[in-house]
């Protein structure tokens, strides 16, 4: 679904956008959020993309960065402590309409002894229905239950918990084609159509528990504006409980902006561009982490997919894994090699000043990268079970592809295709499957990152 319940049923929302005066105008203009628009039809013939890709999900062509009134593109306002609900909106009484589904913006009714809410479709791996529990111990084992100690430089005494993904299921899907704007894309809305159908048919995500924001919809609350995106992010994580499974999917333009708080070793924050970014500004990774990651309690799964450029660390998750399932850390050897090459080059020229300057620059860069990495583990580690799949590294672009005559994002296609071919894969197997789907056509490298140290040999559940 792609509408919101009235504010009396939805207390959350970003306090900064739109301003209070604009909120009042919007409430006067839209006295109720109305009925949901018709659902997207199922998308068939999801075939491999053609080559070459017609475009890139990079920066929208424009002079400079979009205007914004603060370092992170939003008007600052007092924020509640992490783990608390966002400020209340002024209540108002909408016209009478049937009540929304209990799962949409509300806690589901209590059903003691009802068992897990999700048992999986045939072939889909769950913690209780997979090859490993049926005796094939060469298959990926399901995630453990209970708390797991962190280690790996995380705060001492801290623990996290894997989600078994049997609880409440909610999804936020955002696709922006930027109609009528420079840098218009073609496949982002199709990505949302395909993903919503896949989640509904294969993982039992109910349509009424999906918020869909695309710029082809007439309902103003369904447009992917900055205000709507931020409000929907708050809705997604509201009232989350252990073993819930939340899903976030963004397909659109992504980019980078100078980092102002020192949490990025390359000096740039990753951003996404709402449909109204030229007026409202972009959304920075720090803000997405604050809204969608930090409030989550232990045992809640958030699966995030960013099919956009420069998206490798779009949620600022500190644990990034290679296709060998190994935790990536700052590559000091690579930096050392580059630094040594510069020193040797300067020595060969007899330029002692440059040699010293190059050596000192390398030391500072390597030290800064290691310090940033350690600080990220201390401040961005989470007890929740947050997994992010991104279409490219921070320095790469992502392809806007054509799939059997239909425009779509390469990562969105590869993710669904890889899971359909083999639903019972470990994390590292799925990462390699996605990479293999992309490898024959594109240079982009998919990324897997997590909010906690991850055993990549465990069964991937969702």
UniProtKB/Swiss-Prot annotation:
GO molecular function, one term: cysteine-type endopeptidase activity
Entry keywords, A to Z: Apoptosis, Hydrolase, Protease, Thiol protease, Zymogen
Listed GO biological process terms: apoptotic process; proteolysis
Name of the molecule in the record: Metacaspase-1
Classification via InterPro entries: Caspase-like_dom_sf, Metacaspase, Pept_C14_caspase
UniProt signal peptide: none
Gene: MCA1
Native source species: Coccidioides immitis (strain RS) (Valley fever fungus)
Domain of life: Eukaryota
Region annotation (Disordered) ranges: 1-150
Family: Belongs to the peptidase C14B family.
Cellular compartments per GO CC: cytoplasm
SUPFAM superfamilies recorded: Caspase-like
Bias type Low complexity, positions: 22-33
Active site positions: 253, 309
E.C. number(s) listed in UniProt: 3.4.22.-
Main function: Involved in cell death (apoptosis).
Sequence ranges of Pro residues compositional bias: 1-21, 49-69, 77-102
């Amino acid at each position: 679904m792609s509408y919101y319940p009235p504010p009396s049923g939805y207390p959350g929302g970003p306090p900064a956008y739109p301003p209070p005066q604009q909120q009042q105008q919007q409430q006067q203009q839209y006295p109720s959020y109305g009925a949901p628009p018709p659902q997207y039809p199922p998308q068939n013939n999801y075939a491999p993309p053609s080559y070459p890709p017609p475009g890139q999900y990079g920066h929208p062509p424009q002079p400079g960065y979009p205007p914004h009134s603060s370092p992170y593109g939003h008007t600052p306002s007092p924020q509640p402590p992490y783990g608390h609900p966002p400020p209340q909106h002024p209540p108002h009484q909408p016209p009478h309409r049937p009540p929304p589904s209990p799962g949409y913006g509300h806690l589901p009714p209590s059903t003691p002894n009802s068992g897990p809410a999700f048992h999986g479709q045939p072939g889909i791996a769950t913690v209780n229905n997979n090859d490993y529990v049926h005796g094939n111990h060469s298959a990926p084992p399901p995630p453990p239950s209970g708390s797991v100690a962190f280690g790996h430089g995380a705060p001492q005494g801290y623990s996290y918990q894997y989600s078994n993904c049997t609880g409440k299921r909610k999804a936020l899907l955002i696709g922006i084609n930027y109609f009528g704007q420079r840098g218009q894309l073609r496949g982002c809305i199709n990505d949302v159509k395909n993903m919503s159908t896949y989640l509904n048919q294969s993982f039992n995500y109910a349509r009424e528990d999906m918020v869909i924001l695309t710029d082809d919809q007439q309902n103003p609350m369904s447009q992917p504006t900055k205000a709507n995106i931020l409000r929907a992010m708050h809705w997604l994580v509201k009232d989350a409980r252990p073993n819930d499974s939340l899903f976030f999917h963004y397909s659109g333009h992504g980019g980078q902006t100078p980092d102002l708080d020192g949490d990025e070793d390359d000096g740039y924050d990753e951003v996404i561009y709402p449909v109204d970014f030229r007026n409202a500004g972009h959304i920075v990774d720090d803000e997405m982490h604050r809204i969608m990651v930090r409030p989550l309690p232990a045992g809640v799964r958030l699966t995030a997919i960013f099919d956009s450029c420069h998206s490798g660390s779009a949620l600022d998750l500190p644990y990034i894994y290679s296709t060998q399932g190994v935790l990536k850390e700052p590559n000091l050897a690579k930096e050392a090699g580059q630094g040594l090459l510069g020193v040797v080059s300067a020595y060969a020229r007899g330029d002692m000043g440059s040699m010293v300057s190059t050596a000192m620059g390398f030391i500072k860069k390597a030290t800064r990268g290691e310090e940033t990495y350690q600080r990220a583990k201390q401040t961005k580690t989470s007890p929740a079970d947050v997994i992010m799949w991104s279409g490219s590294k921070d320095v790469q672009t992502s392809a806007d592809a054509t799939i059997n005559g239909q425009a779509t994002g390469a990562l969105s296609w590869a993710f669904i295709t890889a899971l359909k071919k083999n639903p019972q894969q470990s994390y590292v197997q799925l990462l390699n499957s996605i990479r293999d789907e992309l490898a024959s056509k594109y240079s982009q490298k998919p990324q897997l990152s997590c909010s906690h140290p991850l055993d990549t040999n465990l069964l991937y559940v969702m």
